[in-house]
Amino acid sequence: MAATSALMTRAFRVLPTARTARMHTAALGGLCQSHTRMAGIQRAARQSTCLPLPRSFRHRVSTRFLSQTASSPESTSLSNEARQELESKIKAKGDAIRAMKEDGVSKQDLAPHVAELLELKSQLDPLSSSSPAPTTTQKAKPDTKQTKSDTEESDYITSRSENYSKWYNDIIRVCDLAEPSPVRGCMVIKPWGMSIWDQIRNDLDARIKEHGAENAYFPLLIPKSFLSKEAEHVDGFAKECAVVTHHRLTVDTTEGPNKGGLIADPEAELEDPLIIRPTSETMIWNMFKKWIVSHRDLPLKVNQWANVMRWEMRTRPFLRTSEFLWQEGHTAHATAEGAIQDSKDMLDQYAELCRDLLAIPVIKGAKSPSERFAGAEETFTIEALMQNGWALQSGTSHFLGQSFGKAFDVTFQDAEGKQQDVWGTSWGVSTRLIGALIMTHSDDAGLVLPPRVAPVQVVVVPIPPKKNDEEGRIALNNALDTLVADLKGKGLKVKVDDRDYVRNGAKYFEWERKGVPLRIELGPRDVKGGVCVFKYRVGKEDKETVSLDEAATKAVDGLDELQGYLLEAAKERLAAGINLMATYEQMKEALEKDEASEYNGPGLYLVPWKCDATNEEKIKEECKATIRCYPTDVNEAGMWKGKKCFYSGEDATHMALFGRAF
């Protein structure tokens, strides 16, 4: 340890820059961890059960073990056949848990599966679940090592190349975007994550209103009988629905372990159970029946910002959770053409939102019949490519035909006085866009936010003068106030980090991890020189000295340049990530072993395809690939004509985009 202290002294004597400081700190951290590990090994050796025990203690242990073995008939009651069956179950459950870990499933969601595994193991070896408690002479030691590792883990970001799924989860945790809640599959969106959603919501809400829709709100609870009215719709959501069956709790007075606890009151059971909304088509079309009478009431367009519940088995923060936030638009039209055009127009709005606000290029297209929304005649989608080569469905719009109108008896009187059925659409995006944002732009250092969606576009870090330099302090404050006013005057979102209890280096590190696009440093020397220092999150490696008089204008120009830089980088990655005209064998070989945890995967495959649900399912089973969409541009251009399906060899009907997806 003395050598370590000497090394630390020498290291901190020669730190020329903040970057080398971080490098030295990381190196010293590894060295200190090595000492900690050596100390842990020495402690473990002293406590190891492999070392000789005192004779009297050996006698007590042997006697206790023999008595337990003799009194445990379960330990010898398993037949060879039963033991083999149990071992097979243990192996299968272990493999399933490992697969979920590779997919980035949270510890909370893994817990019940781990409990099942332990239960199976206890059946195989009953003694493992009934180990004797330590005797009074054995003193329990606090698990300080575990506490330390938890602390280290909370600040550590796994590299993308090491494990892409874990990197994604680390970004969310370290950058304070969200964390697991006590409710299975539900997350707590923290202020920084929520502020990003606010930026998305504000931009999209203006687009929705420009589209002609008005905001409304509909109940969270939907009568089960409503879902039963549209057969395809209920089939699509039945397995994901959370059901409310009682309207009151009561104290359990029956004898048993739960006596005095709360139970659902048997006398408060609902005649028609309520569904926590998975989506709101049924509730909204029930209301449309009251609101639509004449052709003059059409088109009718409403939108709501809300939360929905879909009981997911395998969750991933932002990308797939049991509860999530979204907007859902619902429209009614007099003609099919009007409804289809509305669906396509809204998909264009979603694509522009991703491009202009999030700097994410997307592929627009139609879903295959197997992938359509439950109850829709056509589903349109935007698909984005993540850094690991997997696709992410980022928004959808649906042409519903007349299915919901007929299910809820929604009609209108046309100009000739005849009753006609109504045509419908629905469309939506969710907090999944935050996941897309993370996976598209972020790096191993933390979150990277395009300037237009960043909650804070510029963070200004003032560097205070010496304590007794009152003149310097006043000059710095005046320059700071002017700089901030100039930046805000240009419409920028600015944060001043003047915390006096946090070192400047720690501030830089924190805001870099949170993805703030531009940091401005302002110290006494800068003020005297009439300058400040710019440091961009990405795009420009070096710091830039800028005149205070030009700082606001330079910041606007630099942030616009950064927005374009991120979009172009994502476009290049998308273009490079699409494999053209591959054979099925080539795609299968590349995708069947591709996992979400791998970085720089094979990407997407644009191939000629004959629409066939049976073959589509076979491909999904063989290499886990799905049709992400039939891309609009290449299919409208007839690129599939004259080509053979890459799977069946028959005449193609579409160009299909295949790939693995989150």
Task: Label each region the model flagged.
Residues 47-49:
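Residue-level detector of alpha-helical hydrophobic segments embedded in or interacting with membranes
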